[in-house]
Each structure stands twice: as structure tokens, then as C-alpha cells.
Amino acid sequence: MTTALRQRESANAWEQFCQWIASTENRLYVGWFGVIMIPTLLTATICFIIAFIAAPPVDIDGIREPVAGSLMYGNNIISGAVVPSSNAIGLHFYPIWEAASMDEWLYNGGPYQLVVFHFLIGIFCYMGREWELSYRLGMRPWICVAYSAPVAAATAVFLIYPLGQGSFSDGMPLGISGTFNFMLVFQAEHNILMHPFHMLGVAGVFGGSLFSAMHGSLVTSSLVRETSENESQNYGYKFGQEEETYNIVAAHGYFGRLIFQYASFNNSRALHFFLAAWPVVGIWFTSLGISTMAFNLNGFNFNQSVMDSQGRVISTWADILNRANLGFEVMHERNAHNFPLDLAAVKAPSIIG
């Protein structure tokens, strides 16, 4: 009898826990994805903060020349970073227990893998949690679809690119100047500025910013007057009110006359779908571009494409970009190799006659 009561009590406790996890009445929704998301993101955040402040230098190139990234080793907020794991580790999974000592783990950049893997699992689960909450509230699932764009971008630079290049040392450093260094080296090695998918991503991000500003300014300029000139116009809106707070007909008429009629949306639902879809699709394409360049399917090469009738090269923007790429190439990882492949493969100019 006692055993049966204890089983019923434990079952009730489990049911209560399940109900609490899945309850939409909590101040912050937890969800089953949240059960994984919360510890992984906390782990990534705590390890990142500690490593950013106090991690010792990391032998990123695997040539016994450690690179310092933490604040305690002379960096500031701009120059500091969690340095990627060593090229000597390559693509090996490198948890703490794989190293002979904590010093070795830190020297080889173990914290980078710990932060990145927990962070990726955390943001995957955050996306799943968005779907889960939408499902329980009876909403459509497009919020998590939109969030998949930055998730895809993070996955591309932290996971797909290192996998394609053969080492986590090629992943993006976790810092401001480290991010810029990653971008410059990526341009040097893959000519990303000449990749059409990157161009679509630029159009998505800049276009999304433009459309967001246009939409916000149009709505703000066509608000229905509910307040006096001495009050904030924000007091003219009450949360949950049924009537429109701005005149979409006036906004449509203004924009249609400013450009032309069919450049202006007359359907609020179609407009907001467009505002969401444009940057999301652009970032999807950029993520896909990085994922293809990870395997060295690089941007277009139009070097020395234009020549005069005598066969002399007429330099174009592509040639200027190529020279910049070579400059980036020779400046990064200076001691890891004597000559970059691009320069070593060039035939030496003749000095005879």
C-alpha cells in the first residue's frame, strides 16, 4: 500500500512538472526545448565571460606561437576575443577530459569549442521553443522561420565553415576585432564580395533596414490624431484597442504618389509578410554562400578580363579587389607559411631583355 502511494505521489510530481514546463501562464515560457536551451546558453555565456576576461594565450595556428585574446593578457573590449581552438586539434572534438591537463586544454583553445557547441545547441533550442510556444498559443509558425536566418548564419561561420576548411581554428573568433579579422581573411581566401549569394545577403540586410525605416516613418506620419499637441502621440493608443491606430489609406496614397501606385502595398498582411521575408531570404542566401565557400566554391574571378587590342590588361575593379585580396593574404598567419598559395603559384617575371 505504501509503495502504491509513493508511486502515485511521484507520478503526480512528474505530471505537475510537465504541466509547469508546458504552461503558457508562466511569466517566461520554459517549454521542453527550454529544458535544453537554458543550461546550454548559461554554460556558453559563463564560459565566454570567464575566457574573455582571463583565458591564457591560445596556439591558434598550431605552430607554438600563442595568440592572447583575454582582457587580463593586455586586450581591451575591442581587441579581446575567445580565440579559436588550435590548428593542431583540427576537427577533433576537444572537451576538457580529452586534454592531459587544464593548462593543455586552455593552451589549445578548448574554451572556444565549449562556447560554440553549447551556443549552437542553445540557439537551435531557442528556435524550437519559439515554435513550441506558437503551437501552444494557436499561432502560425513563422516566427521561428524568421529566426532561422540568424541561426543559419551562426551555424555557417561557427560549424559549417570550420568543417569545410578542416579545422576549428578557421572558425570565427568570439570578439569584435576577431570578427573583422575573420571577414578580411574570408575575403582574401574566398573572394566573398564577388559571390552572388553574398550580394543577395547585402540586399537583404540593407533593403530590410530601408523598408523598416520606410514603414515606420509612414505609419508614424499617418497616425490617427487622438491627442492634443501638448500630449505625446503615444497616449493615443490603448493596448488591445480594436480600431486602427493609423490610416493605411493615407499612407498608401502618399507612397503611391511619391513613387508610383503599384510600389505601395494596399494590403497590410502582404506588407508585413514582405517586411519579414526580404531580410530573412537574404540572410539565408548569405549563409548558403558561406557554406559553399567553406568547401572552396568561391566568388567569381574576373581578374584581367579586359584587354586592349595589343593584349595589354586594362585594370578593372576586379583587379583592384584581387590586389587587396593578395595584401590580406600575405598579412595573415605570417609565420604559419612563407608564401600564400596565390603568390607562390605566380610565375616569376622575366628579367632578361
UniProtKB/Swiss-Prot annotation:
Site (Cleavage) residue list: 344-345
Chain residues that bind chlorophyll a PD1: 198
Propeptide: 345-353
Localization: Cellular thylakoid membrane
Transmembrane segments: 29-46, 118-133, 142-156, 197-218, 274-288
UniProt: Fe cation binding residues: 215, 272
Marked site (Stabilizes free radical intermediate) residue numbers: 190
Catalytic activity: 2 a plastoquinone + 4 hnu + 2 H2O = 2 a plastoquinol + O2
Annotated InterPro entries: D1/D2, Photo_II_D1/D2_sf, Photo_RC_L/M, Photo_RC_L/M_CS, PSII_D1
Subunit structure: PSII is composed of 1 copy each of membrane proteins PsbA, PsbB, PsbC, PsbD, PsbE, PsbF, PsbH, PsbI, PsbJ, PsbK, PsbL, PsbM, PsbT, PsbX, PsbY, PsbZ, Psb30/Ycf12, peripheral proteins PsbO, CyanoQ (PsbQ), PsbU, PsbV and a large number of cofactors. It forms dimeric complexes.
Protein purpose: Photosystem II (PSII) is a light-driven water:plastoquinone oxidoreductase that uses light energy to abstract electrons from H(2)O, generating O(2) and a proton gradient subsequently used for ATP formation. It consists of a core antenna complex that captures photons, and an electron transfer chain that converts photonic excitation into a charge separation. The D1/D2 (PsbA/PsbD) reaction center heterodimer binds P680, the primary electron donor of PSII as well as several subsequent electron acceptors.
Protein family per UniProt: Belongs to the reaction center PufL/M/PsbA/D family.
Name used for this protein in its record: Photosystem II protein D1
Species, as recorded: Prochlorothrix hollandica
Lineage of producing organism: Bacteria, Bacillati, Cyanobacteriota, Cyanophyceae, Prochlorotrichales
